Design a protein with these regions (language model features):
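S-adenosyl-L-methionine-dependent methyltransferase catalytic core, i.e., the SAM/SAH-binding region
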Residues: 1-141
Length: 141
């Protein structure tokens, strides 16, 4: 899909969302079009707004800004954000393993508080856009 969008963009610039939809539409099954289009627009928004870079920068600052006992509460709205938040809270960095100190002990700045919280049925009924929200809470050690 990306290669088709890029090749079409070389022929005619994409100036409106309608232009992009016209490129995407023939590439997707009609019953899944809305899902595919949403993902394309989400990817563009994430890249244009540098959302993952901003989140990473924010998380890196929290271990220095929060005092011991301070709480970090982060709501993520899609899997890329949630993975970053989860790894940072669990490992103190963005990789899959935590850093070790000179003695081989894991050195993490946060302690996870409870489980991830998702919207209740009542919240979903009142606010459908909350369906993908995940709240993670950690305490500075």
């Amino acid at each position: 899909m990306v290669s088709v969008i890029i090749s079409n963009r070389k022929i005619n610039p994409i100036t409106t969302t309608h232009d992009l939809i016209n490129i995407i539409k023939p590439l997707t099954p009609s019953r899944f079009f809305r899902k595919y289009a949403s993902k394309v627009f989400q990817a563009i928004r994430i890249e244009v707004n540098k959302e993952l870079d901003v989140l990473k920068s924010f998380l890196e600052q929290t271990s220095e800004l929060l005092l011991p006992g301070g709480r970090l509460c982060v709501i993520s709205y899609h899997s890329l954000e949630d993975r970053m938040v989860k790894r940072y809270i669990t490992n103190g960095n963005f990789s899959t393993t935590a850093k070790k100190d000179l003695y081989g002990n894991f050195s993490v700045p946060f302690k996870k508080i409870g489980k991830m919280i998702q919207p209740s049925a009542v919240e979903l009924k009142e606010n459908i856009r909350s369906r993908s929200a995940k709240l993670r809470i950690a305490e500075k050690i």
